[in-house]
Amino acid sequence: MKSILNDFLLMIQFFTRIPINKNLQCEKVNFRRGAFFLPVVASIIGGMEFLIYLGLKNFLPPNVIIVLLLLFTAMITGGLHMDGLADTCDGFFSLRDKERIIEIMKDSRMGAFGTIAMIINLLLKYQLLYSLVLKDCSIAIILAPVIGRISILFLCLSKRTAKKNGSGNIFIGNMSKPIIFLITIIALAMNTYFLELKITIISFTAVLIITYLFYLLCLNKINGLTGDTLGACNELGEITFLLILLMM
């Protein structure tokens, strides 16, 4: 029980800015087991956002609330996944060789492509969430972060790392397939509880397709995956899910 709590708190500490004033074991096995809690952490973040939405919806217009939710997400996650998207776009769109792309992705300075990608990402999320709220589908606020993290886990089934060292190497190729599939079943069951089965199947299939296509792009560009590409995959997964949800 103690090890389970350790791994759960480790995921909160690693993926959020929620203060965990506790010394935790952080070996590779802890991250491997802790991956089970990644969608749980996402649902906690989404749940907090949903509570903010419920608390403000009678006082502020939906568009203002969505902006505040995006700000809250950036603060609670430290912009971790959006930063990965920006770095990935800076590198991939530079049209350089693998080594130079990875150097660009490691650069803390944001380039033009990263800036454009982040702006488009935020605009898309804003418009999609706003439109879904108007359609009385505010539950998407909770579901989208969960699906995004599921896409990360599927990407981590690959053992192809683009760098010898990096934070992403903790997860890439070190995930348990049975755990990932169990998490997926639980996430799909949760989705089906709130959405029609048809919508769940179509949206999740679309996310898997986008995840696989992105994986092929990563192989083509840098012959593997990095922590930045995992973050980018999360953002792509969330956007894809929200798009399909709005279309349905």
Swiss-Prot record:
GO cellular component: plasma membrane
Subcellular location: Cell membrane
Cofactor: Mg(2+)
Keywords: Cell membrane, Cobalamin biosynthesis, Magnesium, Membrane, Transferase, Transmembrane, Transmembrane helix
Keyword rRNA processing: no
Known catalytic reactions: alpha-ribazole + adenosylcob(III)inamide-GDP = adenosylcob(III)alamin + GMP + H(+); alpha-ribazole 5'-phosphate + adenosylcob(III)inamide-GDP = adenosylcob(III)alamin 5'-phosphate + GMP + H(+)
UniProt-listed Enzyme Commission number(s): 2.7.8.26
Topology term for the membrane: Multi-pass membrane protein
Cross-referenced Pfam families: CobS (PF02654)
Membrane spanning residue stretches: 36-56, 59-79, 113-133, 137-157, 170-190, 199-219
The protein's annotated pathway: Cofactor biosynthesis; adenosylcobalamin biosynthesis; adenosylcobalamin from cob(II)yrinate a,c-diamide: step 7/7
Superkingdom of this protein's organism: Bacteria
GO molecular function list: adenosylcobinamide-GDP ribazoletransferase activity; cobalamin 5'-phosphate synthase activity
One GO-annotated biological process of the protein: cobalamin biosynthetic process
Biological role: Joins adenosylcobinamide-GDP and alpha-ribazole to generate adenosylcobalamin (Ado-cobalamin). Also synthesizes adenosylcobalamin 5'-phosphate from adenosylcobinamide-GDP and alpha-ribazole 5'-phosphate.
Family that this chain belongs to: Belongs to the CobS family.
Protein name: Adenosylcobinamide-GDP ribazoletransferase
Originating organism: Clostridium botulinum (strain 657 / Type Ba4)
Gene: cobS
